[in-house]
Amino acid sequence: MENRYSVHPEQAKRFTTAELREHFLIESLFVENKLNMFYSHEDRVVIGGAVPVKESIALDAGDFLKTDYFLERREIGIVNVGKPGAVKVGDEEYVLEHKDFLYIGLGNKDVFFSSLNEGGAKFYFISATAHQKYPVQKASLSELPYDHLGEEASSNVRNLYKVIHADGIQSCQLMMGITFLEPNNTWNTMPAHVHDRRMEVYLYLDLAEDAKVFHFMGEPTETRHLVVGNEQAVISPAWSVHSGSGTSNYCFIWAMAGENYTFKDMDAVPMNVIR
């Protein structure tokens, strides 16, 4: 597991491009036959990828978390971003199709990731600290309601799925969902916002090899950008905007953790303020 320490905004605005990428971008999340994890000190979230090819992979942090097992004091949200796969929780196995979600609450000791049939499952997950146990729940993308948002004139027509949140799958503090931009639409989260009470992570998906998203971050009056490719994630501290525009349409998985569990708790940034 790799540490990603917190960064003060006064420090971040002086970073070079390389330093911004080193602290906030996760470039290589998915590695075959490996559990790859990043420990962000922004609200203590663990960002990870598991790509089981030859055999199943256990959810195990070794000695890093100083607990007897990964979910002893944590909860986790999982999305399969590859071909069909399964997550085994204790004696129960949950089959996840492409972009299906699974929530696993505190106290579940044995968790394993595996591929089905021809292989190719690819699991993305976010874990946050937890104080109460909630039941394991699966959400199939094909069965989920969504909010249709945006306008063609603003190039931001999109479908937003809220999955783990106060009115959906229950958790202690983790919130998670996915947003799909429609063809010929490229902007997400603009006008921008911040939420000083929780951090957020974006995982960008469905981008061609030569397509990129220009992800904007930083304080509203000190924005910077990261050039992001397919299956790369961005850590957004509570003080940072998180918005982007792509060279094509795409989708992104968003996940939040922190003090407030209200999805609409955000502070809008007027367009005449952002710099």
From Swiss-Prot:
Q: Which Pfam families match?
A: KduI (PF04962)
| Residues the entry annotates as binding Zn(2+) | 193, 195, 200, 242
Pathway assignment reads:
Glycan metabolism; pectin degradation; 2-dehydro-3-deoxy-D-gluconate from pectin: step 4/5
* Keyword Metal-binding tagged: yes
Enzyme Commission number, as recorded: 5.3.1.17
Q: Name one GO biological process term.
A: pectin catabolic process
The residues that cross the membrane are: none
Q: Cite the entry's keywords alphabetically.
A: Isomerase, Metal-binding, Zinc
- Which EC class heads this enzyme's classification? isomerase
Which GO-annotated molecular functions does the record name? Answer: 4-deoxy-L-threo-5-hexosulose-uronate ketol-isomerase activity; zinc ion binding
Does the keyword Transport belong to this entry? Answer: no
Q: What does the record give as cofactor?
A: Zn(2+)
Q: Which reaction does it catalyse?
A: 5-dehydro-4-deoxy-D-glucuronate = 3-deoxy-D-glycero-2,5-hexodiulosonate
HAMAP family referenced in this protein's UniProt entry, alphabetically: KduI
Q: What does this protein do?
A: Catalyzes the isomerization of 5-dehydro-4-deoxy-D-glucuronate to 3-deoxy-D-glycero-2,5-hexodiulosonate.
Protein name, UniProt field = 4-deoxy-L-threo-5-hexosulose-uronate ketol-isomerase
